[in-house]
Amino acid sequence: MAHNPVGINSTLTTNTTSGTTRSVDKTLHKTDALRVVAVGAGAHIAIGTFPTATTANYYIANGESEVITLGACRNQTVVGIVTVGVAGTNKSRTVVAFPEGTGSPFQLGDAVTLTVTNQDYWNFTHQIVVGVSTSTNPSGFFNQRILIDNDYGVGYAHTALVATNFAELRGSFMVAALGDATGKLHYQQVQSSKGANG
């Protein structure tokens, strides 16, 4: 089967004592398939928001490679970003707005990553969705908006999102592994002749 690699190859060190060994790159979800290779030891693999691998999870034998389905990619263009205070604390959360006429592909508990060209101070990585507007006119806005548990830590100092700058919110995931012994787990998103999308 032909594979078209997407993004970078990442590596985890696997061992028998920790099922919480996770990828540190918090991978952007760009295809519906993840190719994994176990080197030095077999491993159980878990994929998710903050996964923990156990012996109940998918197993790949030492020296073998497999392609695991990730499900459909979820991403949406962002047209507005604001911060809101959390009552009784010094913290804030982030509200992102999507274009009118579109909806949110994200649900409560999803991990998301925001990328903004030319305004990278708005960027954040692998933060959790804690609220999704369901009204057709939430607080006077006709855009669908979601609330994300992301605190920039700088109050309201950022310059507003520039309309001509591209901003995208995309789902992200982490990989965890529990090895039969000390080894390496290599993984990379791929597009394949079977129809992986991105």
Indicate where each model-derived feature is located.
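Short, intrinsically disordered N-terminal pre-domain segments
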Residues: 1-24, 186-198
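Surface-exposed ligand/attachment interfaces on beta-rich extracellular proteins
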Residues: 9-30, 51-54, 86-102, 119, ...
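Intrinsically disordered, low-complexity Pro/Gly/Ser/Thr-rich segments with frequent PxxP/GP/PP motifs
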Residues: 10, 51-74
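Beta-sandwich interaction modules
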Residues: 21-26, 63-72, 170-174
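Hydrophobic beta-strand segments within beta-rich accessory/binding domains
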Residues: 31-38, 175
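Short, surface-exposed beta-strand/strand-loop-strand elements in extracellular ectodomains
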Residues: 37-57
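Small/polar beta-strand repeat architecture
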Residues: 73-93, 97-189, 196-198
